[in-house]
Each structure stands twice: as C-alpha cells, then as structure tokens.
C-alpha cells in the first residue's frame, strides 16, 4: 500500500482498497472507478435488475466499459469474475489487530505479532487440547513463534529427529489448515513461499483421515525429511501461520521513543504483509529530525539520553554522538548534572561512569533544545508559544525563575553557554555541534528509508470498517464542538479537514516539488506538532520539560489535558466527532492511544458507552508500574471486538529457551449477533461496486453495445 498524497481521501481509499482486493482475487485488478462515490447499500442480488441502463450518449461510460472488457473480454470471463467476487463476499472478515504506543519495545512488539496476541495459542489448544499435554502445546507454540531458534535447540536434544520432524509437520499442517480456513485458496496461495507453495497446498487440502490419501500425505512428509528440507519447510509453514493469523495490522502511533529497538520494529514492518499507521507525536518528532528541524533533533537525542537508550540512534541509524560527548565533557565537566542522570531500570546495563557521561551529554543537548525551540518560537509568533521561552524568565544572579507570576528557585543555575542578554543565541561551539548533528541525521540512509515507510503507510487518521483511528486527540472547544486551529498564517481548519491538511503539510516537508518557503514552514511545524497546545498529537497546555529538570515544585510540572480528554467519556461528544468524520453505521467507534490507561487505578479503556477505545496500555517498560500492565491489543475479528491485556514480556531468549509466552487476558468488548463477512467491510463495499460494473459489462455484451473479445 502506497499513500502518496493525502490522509484517507476518497481517492486514496479507492487505491488502497484496490490493492486489498488484489489479495482476495486471482483475476487481474479492475480499472478503478473514478468518482469514488460510496458503494450503494443495495445487495448484489438486486443490483442488476434495477440498475440504470448504459447511456450511449455518454462516451466515457462506454469507453470505460470497453477498457474493462480488456480484462474480461467475454460473457464467460465477466460472469466467472462475478461468481468469484460474490463468493468472496460470503467469507468471514479477516482479523484486524490494533496496537498503539510501542515506544521502541521491539521484543514485545515482535512477540505479539508472532503469537497473534495469543490467538495462535488458542488455536493450538482448540486443535490439540485433548491430545497434547500443556508442555507439548507450549513447545509447539514456541516453534511457531521462533522456528529458526527453536529448531536449533530441538536438534541439539532430540534423539530421533526424523520421527520428531514427521510428527511436528503433521501438527503444523493442522494449525495452518485452521488459520487459513477463512480465506480463499488464492489468498492462501499468495502467502506461501515459492519453494513450498505446491507442497503446502497439497498438505492443506488432503488429510490422513481419508485412508486413500494417508499414504500420499505421509509420502510427501517423508520425502521432505529424506531430502534434508525439513528445517526449511518447518520455518516456511510457521511463517505462513503467523501471517495468516493477522490479516491487517493497525498501529495507532508512536513506534519511536525511549525503547532500544524502534529501528528493529521498522525493519519488521518493512517485511510485513499488511499494515498502516496513524502517526503519533514521537513519530512526527523523528520525521522532523530527518527533515532537518534542529529542535526536533535535540528532542530525539535528549529522550534517548534520558533513558540511556542509544541503540536506535547509534547502531540503528548511525548517528554520531562523539561530538556531543566531547562538547559535553568540555562544557559541563565540572557540573554534577544530578537532575540529568538517566532513568535506568536495570543498573547493571549501564555502569556509573557511563551514566555520568550520559548526564553531561543530556544537559548539553537539553540546553541546546531550549535554545533551538526558542528560536522557532521567535520566528513564528503566530503559534503563540512565547510563554515557553523560559530563559527570558530566569534571574541568573539569584538563580530563580518566574512561572505564572510565581518565583521559584532553580535546582541548578549553571548555564555556561547562556547569555542573559541573548539567551537563545548559540555559542560558536554549540553551532558547530548542532551543524554536525544536523548533518548526521540528514545523511542517515536507513532513517530516510524508515521515514519513507511511515509516509507510505501512514496518515494522521484513517477510517476502516466504521472505525475512526487516530493517535491522540481531536481539538475541541469547551462545549465539545470542533475547534478551529490555524496551521498556517490565515489558514484554519477543524476536525477532519484539520487532520487532513496537517497530513498534507507533513508530506510537503519531504517533497522536492514543494515551494522552498512551504517546505521550510512544514519543517518548522514539526516542533509545534510535537508540543503545541492545539496540536492533535499533543493537546495539552504545555510540555513541562524545563520545569521537570530545573524546578522542585511539582505544581509547575502539571500539563493540563485538552478538552478532548476531558469530554471523551461523553457519548454524544464521541458521536458528534464520528459524524464530523463521516463515520456511519450502528457499530462505529473511535480507537486511539497516546495517554496510558491506568488499569492499576481502576481506569477503564472502554469509554463513551463502548464507542471509544483507548489502547495505550504501556508497552514501554517505563510505564509498566504506572499502568499496571504491559500493553493492549485490540482484536477485531468476524465475531466482534476483543481487548487483549498483556503482562510484561521478559525476553525473546526466555520465550525460546523456556517456552515462556506473554501472559494475556482477553476481554470481550462487543460481539456481533451474526458472524461478520467480507460483505460487511470496506473491501466488501468495493467488491460490490465491482460486481455492479461487471454486470453493466454483461449488459453491454448481451445488447450488442460492446462486442466480445475486445471488438468494437
């Protein structure tokens, strides 16, 4: 899926749906319908008889059908396609998984994908609950999740490996058969690796229950083993099971942040079959850093140093932090920097000497951040961020600062690079450092590749199967009405138009054909998206970074949430937002993340009488104590919604060696009165539209308007 221009525009929806349809059909894709109008609510059974006849005076109408006839040149071909599409409409809808706020926790993220949020474990139990012991089921699941690594352990300990291969392949084929049962053979075939496509298809569609076929099936498996291909086959079919267990992955923002593996998550997604993302505030911060926004660069580095997680910066993207370390030691070497000591959960991971160096670097980049932010606030007075230019409020002789009219003592008054007369001016050494950091981000090829992926698969919001997806907030007035927000001088928007135009502005920062002035403004605007009060990715009164570092009084640390967060429990407010975005249907929802759900304090992630679901459960290990859990997955399958609540994941190594899985608790949120079919989904609407056009083509064939086999 490649989103080139807008956020969920009608044209984009058609383009994306077409690509999804290609997964469902073996035929060549039909020509896209240009007007993008919503599909008619009529059923396919009565579409043909009451349709409007073809208008012979409308040349485009006939021209379109002639173009369509190139793919379906005969009555037989068009009829066959209608039969195929109608059959697809009657399949169960695919399983969607929703995740939010991963924050660089790559091991937990990858494990949740591998075990399909516990669904594979349930499938194994459904199949073998009465025939395999618990320990054997656990071993089989571990093999499915981590086939390469588990095979090495098995081969080192199994006395009769060929016997193990034979039994295990039978088990894996049974699991694969179950998870593939809701899809067409065509779609399953496309998920199969080329080397084993035919073999897996044969094994899926034949069973040993039939005495006539038992020898055939066992013969295939014996040959796989005797030719030395058992390992490769097992790895291949395990990957197929993983892929077919999740039809579509939705990420509601914040892949990036404090965790060590955001780059690993992006590498995983680059290979993933179907996914989309609604950008979060941390994602746009990294986008801004790549675009060249120096304040964003400082924020990205500061957050990594705050949690002593430099792996993504240094190992993932090759960002050179040596100049920062050198500058920090020279400038702050005699500063205790106590308030800048990193937050380290595992003290054995970072020794004291390294923590001390990180603290120096942390302060150096924080001061640079405040300067670069101040310069942008000065450059853009229309953003009304002057109150965040806190260097102006410091009495450098007394070591105090005035916040909201109250004078507070500073924890530290050591600002060797800040001039009281011109506090936001960079020293020559700071400027040289900033230039080097800027260059390092701009030339990171891997970061370019990953941000390109975010742009291709992402947007500010998405509407999918009557669900409105966005990361954080919709700016609201106190009365719950949509708030007008100025994103460019003289250009204000609200609701859907606001998110759409912010998405366009984000893309302008990376498009070579953008005007230089527009591109620079878009690059600057990333900072406002990160921490501006009216940003739909932030929506708080302020980001109290300076206060947390330098002021003891915790009252100054308070960040007051915007009206959306105050009103989102109100069902009528949620309904009005859904109406404004054009989300219809009796079972419509808002799904978002951003603000951790404090389960340990009794907070419920389901709000507004079930119409709003907040799925930030704290994937990041830093939030585990705060939320009491280790993240959520929202699962939307053919029978309804389930919320899967995860407990902390130890490590992939423990999962492989000890068979430890993420312990999860599943809650039924909303169940359908009947099993939902493809016909009930967005893809189904598009398939119905295609059926209508094919029926019009049949009409044209049968009434001599267009000749079969491409004739005129």
Question: Which residue stretches match the model-derived regions?
Answer:
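Short terminal hydrophobic/aromatic SLiMs and anchors at protein ends
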Residues: 8-13, 33
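Cationic, low-complexity basic patches in intrinsically disordered or flexible, solvent-exposed regions
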Residues: 20
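Feature recognizes metal-dependent phosphohydrolase scaffolds
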Residues: 2-5, 30, 36, 40-712
């Amino acid at each position: 899926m490649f989103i080139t221009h807008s956020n969920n525009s009608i044209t984009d929806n058609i383009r994306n749906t077409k690509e999804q349809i290609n997964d469902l059909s073996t035929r060549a894709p039909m020509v896209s319908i240009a007007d993008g109008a919503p599909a008619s609510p009529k059923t396919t059974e009565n579409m043909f008889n009451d349709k409007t006849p073809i208008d012979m005076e409308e040349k485009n109408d006939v021209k379109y059908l002639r173009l369509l006839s190139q793919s379906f040149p005969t009555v037989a071909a068009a009829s066959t396609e209608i039969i195929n599409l109608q059959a697809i409409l009657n399949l169960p809808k695919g399983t969607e998984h929703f995740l939010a706020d991963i924050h660089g926790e790559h091991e937990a993220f990858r494990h949740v994908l591998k075990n399909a949020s516990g669904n594979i474990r349930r499938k194994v139990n459904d199949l073998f609950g009465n025939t395999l012991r618990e320990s054997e089921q656990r071993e089989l699941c571990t093999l499915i999740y981590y086939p390469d690594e588990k095979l090495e352990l098995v081969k080192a300990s199994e006395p009769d490996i060929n016997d193990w291969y034979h039994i295990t392949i039978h088990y894996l084929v049974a699991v694969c058969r179950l998870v593939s049962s809701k899809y067409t053979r065509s779609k399953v075939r496309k998920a199969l690796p080329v080397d084993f496509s035919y073999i897996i298809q044969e094994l899926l569609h034949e069973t040993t229950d039939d005495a006539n076929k038992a020898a055939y099936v066992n013969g295939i498996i014996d040959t796989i083993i005797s030719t030395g291909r058992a390992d490769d086959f097992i790895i291949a079919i395990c990957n197929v099971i993983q892929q077919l267990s999740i039809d579509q992955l939705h990420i509601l923002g914040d892949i990036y942040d404090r965790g060590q593996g955001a780059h690993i998550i992006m590498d995983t997604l680059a290979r993933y079959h179907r996914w989309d993302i609604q950008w979060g505030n941390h994602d746009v911060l990294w986008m801004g850093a790549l675009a060249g926004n120096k304040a964003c660069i400082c924020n990205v580095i500061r957050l990594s140093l705050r949690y002593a997680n430099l792996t993504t910066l240094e190992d993932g993207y090759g960002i050179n932090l040596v100049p920062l370390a050198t500058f920090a030691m020279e400038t702050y070497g005699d500063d205790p920097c106590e308030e800048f000591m990193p937050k380290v959960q595992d003290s054995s991971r970072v020794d004291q000497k390294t923590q001390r160096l990180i603290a120096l670097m942390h302060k150096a980049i924080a001061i640079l951040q405040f300067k670069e932010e101040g310069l942008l606030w000065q450059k853009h007075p229309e953003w009304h961020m002057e109150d965040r230019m806190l260097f102006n409020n410091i009495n450098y002789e007394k070591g105090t600062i005035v916040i909201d009219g109250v004078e507070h003592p500073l924890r530290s008054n050591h600002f060797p690079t800040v001039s009281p007369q011109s506090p936001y001016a960079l020293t020559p050494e700071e400027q040289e450092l900033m230039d080097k950091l800027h260059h390092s981000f701009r030339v990171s090829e891997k970061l370019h590749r990953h941000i390109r992926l975010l742009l291709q698969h992402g947007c500010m919001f998405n509407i999918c199967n009557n669900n409105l997806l966005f990361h954080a907030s919709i700016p609201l007035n106190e009365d719950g009405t949509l708030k007008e927000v100025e994103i460019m001088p003289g250009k204000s928007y609200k609701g859907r138009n606001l998110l759409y135009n912010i998405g366009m502005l984000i893309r302008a920062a990376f498009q070579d054909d953008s005007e230089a002035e527009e591109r620079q403004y878009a690059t600057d605007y990333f900072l406002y998206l990160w921490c501006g009060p009216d940003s739909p990715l932030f929506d708080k009164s302020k980001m109290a970074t300076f206060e947390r570092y330098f002021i003891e009084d915790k009252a100054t640390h308070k960040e007051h949430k915007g009206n959306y967060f105050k009103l989102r429990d109100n069902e009528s407010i949620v309904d009005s937002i859904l109406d404004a975005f054009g989300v219809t249907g009796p079972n419509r929802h808002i799904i978002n993340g951003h603000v951790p759900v404090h389960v340990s304090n009794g907070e419920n992630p389901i709000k507004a009488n079930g119409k709003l679901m907040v799925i930030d459960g704290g994937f990041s290990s830093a939030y585990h104590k705060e939320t009491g859990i280790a993240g959520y997955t929202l699962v939307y399958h053919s029978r309804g919604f389930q919320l899967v609540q995860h407990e902390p994941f130890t490590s992939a190594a423990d999962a492989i060696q000890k068979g430890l899985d993420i312990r999860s608790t599943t809650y039924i949120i909303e169940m359908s009165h009947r099993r939902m079919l493809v016909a009930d989904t967005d893809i189904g609407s598009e398939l119905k539209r295609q059926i209508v056009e094919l029926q019009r083509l049949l009409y044209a064939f049968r009434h001599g308007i267009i000749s079969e086999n491409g004739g005129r």
